[in-house]
Amino acid sequence: MEKMYNVGKIVNTHGLIGEIRVIATTDFPEERFQVGNTVYLFEKNSKKPEKLIIRSHRKHKNFDLLMFEGFTGIHQVERMKEGVLKIKEAQLTDLEENEFYFHEIIGCIVVTTDGKELGEITEILTPGANDVWVVKGSDKKEKLIPYIADVVKEININDKKITIEVMEGLLD
């Protein structure tokens, strides 16, 4: 099976006309959820993907609201709750220099400029102005690292290693 990448998690339905509420797990929701694009639904207890074509997309608060071709009512989409939306690797587009996909960053080891290993990036949050990386260390505690130039000094995707400058108060 072709490699697939998460682009969103379905958290609920929205209204009665078959709209679903999605938390995007991609930096490119406008591109991924463009009308006519294909996504693949992996329902909570299923390993077999369902191919879906996006009929509409709009933003509402912190969510992406989607409708799919062939789905016209809440009764048809309720089963999708807690499902994951994915795209095939062939659907990925080339990025500019120093731009990265979430799946390239997640799993990287974070070290400080003085060589101290902080842990592995397990999640990327997108609260607003910049992404925030969740780093879990050997102590199982989570550290939140902002993806800003003052902090992130080097990203080496091939070695899965990211070097950061620890600003005062960052790890307190």
From Swiss-Prot:
Domain of life of the organism encoding this protein: Bacteria
GO MF annotations, alphabetized: ribosome binding
Family annotation (Pfam families): PRC, RimM
Keyword rRNA processing carried by entry: yes
Gene Ontology BP term (one): rRNA processing
Disulfide cross-links: none
Record GO cellular component, one term: ribosome
Record domain PRC barrel: where: 96-170
Keywords per UniProt: Chaperone, Cytoplasm, Ribosome biogenesis, rRNA processing
Subcellular location: Cytoplasm
Major localization listed first in the record, in broad terms: cytoplasm
Subunit structure, interactors included: Binds ribosomal protein uS19.
Domain comment (free text): The PRC barrel domain binds ribosomal protein uS19.
Task of the protein: An accessory protein needed during the final step in the assembly of 30S ribosomal subunit, possibly for assembly of the head region. Essential for efficient processing of 16S rRNA. May be needed both before and after RbfA during the maturation of 16S rRNA. It has affinity for free ribosomal 30S subunits but not for 70S ribosomes.
Family designation: Belongs to the RimM family.
UniProt protein name: Ribosome maturation factor RimM
Gene source species: Listeria monocytogenes serotype 4b (strain CLIP80459)
Designated gene of the protein: rimM
